[in-house]
A protein has these predicted regions:
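Alpha/beta-hydrolase superfamily serine-hydrolase fold, recognizing
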Residues: 1-294
């Protein structure tokens, strides 16, 4: 059950409208993120706009201490069309505060760069992290990947779509209210025009792609494919809660290790809301999971 503390905070937050002009939506998304990116934690350093290759950059949040540090590759949410390393800056720095070199990827966005651009960027980032982590005294063979919403989709898709040698680099996945079966999500959310538009935009209107396991990675779950997964669903999430439950069920069916936690009464997007008790509870559980698996 949601706490009164969290209920009060959520009632005061501005509302983002996921419809309308893409430029205006992106501007509103980044403005809303300034509300979340206050009281940034103290870390070893933050390197902005690090170039991974032409057209692909990331913010790299560096922990304090000598290392070698484990690595987290983080994929921001935003319907494959919004968001940036800046919108998720505080979350990336919180990973670094906990001792993880954190690469918050600025993957290419739709509609300018529809599928498979963001997925290709994510897959490239895994190999890049393995090869370059030592630049920040970090361990290129102790990598976790994570993401929220669309970022959760990309995290799972990157693992299931990669060759075995690349897939083996990822020791764990942390997944917050992701979309893992876009075909089912689109059917379930017909009454939500904003989400329908985001889903369609990601695949450039070619909704047949929803059946592609690179787009809907739930269809690629099989024994030995995914590392241990930490799955968090938002209890008050009409968009993606069913996806989190379905992923857990699919992993259970193939005896693949996972944890599932549903934060009751909490909305989609809460992993940017660090003042929530539900956020702090999810983070405590995640630190324990990562300590065991990375």
């Amino acid at each position: 059950m949601i706490s009164e503390h969290d209920r009060q905070i959520l009632s005061q937050l501005p509302v983002w409208d996921p419809t309308g002009d893409i430029v205006a939506q992106r501007r509103a998304w980044e403005e809303l993120a300034t509300v979340y990116n206050q009281d940034l934690p103290a870390i070893g350093g933050l390197e902005k706009n690090v170039e991974l290759r032409s057209g692909l950059r990331a913010d790299v949040a560096v922990p304090k201490g000598a290392g070698p540090h484990p690595v987290v590759i983080y994929l921001h949410g935003g319907g494959w069309a919004f968001g940036s390393p800046t919108s998720h800056r505080k979350l990336g720095m919180q990973f670094a505060e906990a001792g993880y070199l954190t690469i918050v990827l600025g993957y290419r966005l739709a509609p300018e760069h529809p599928f498979p651009a963001a997925l290709e960027d994510t897959m490239f980032a895994i190999g890049w992290a393995a090869d370059n982590a030592r630049r920040w005294n970090s361990h290129g063979r102790r990598i976790a990947i994570g993401g929220d919403s669309a970022g959760g989709n990309l995290a799972v898709s990157a693992i299931t779509s990669s060759a075995p040698e690349l897939r083996s680099l990822v020791r764990a996945a942390v997944l917050f209210y992701g979309a893992y079966d876009l075909e089912a999500t689109a059917e379930r959310t017909r009454s939500l025009p904003g989400l329908q538009e985001q889903l369609s935009t990601y695949v450039s209107g070619k909704r047949d792609f929803f059946d592609d396991p690179r787009v809907s990675p739930l269809k690629a779950v099989a024994p030995g494919i995914l590392p241990p997964c930490f799955i968090v669903g938002a209890g008050d999430d009409s968009w993606c809660l069913a996806d989190s439950l379905a992923l857990a069920q699919a992993l259970s069916a193939v005896a693949s290790p996972y944890e599932l936690h549903v934060m009751e009464g909490i909305p989609h997007g809460f992993m940017q809301m660090s003042t929530l008790e539900a956020f702090r509870a999810a983070m405590r559980l995640m630190w324990e999971f990562l300590a065991r698996n990375v």
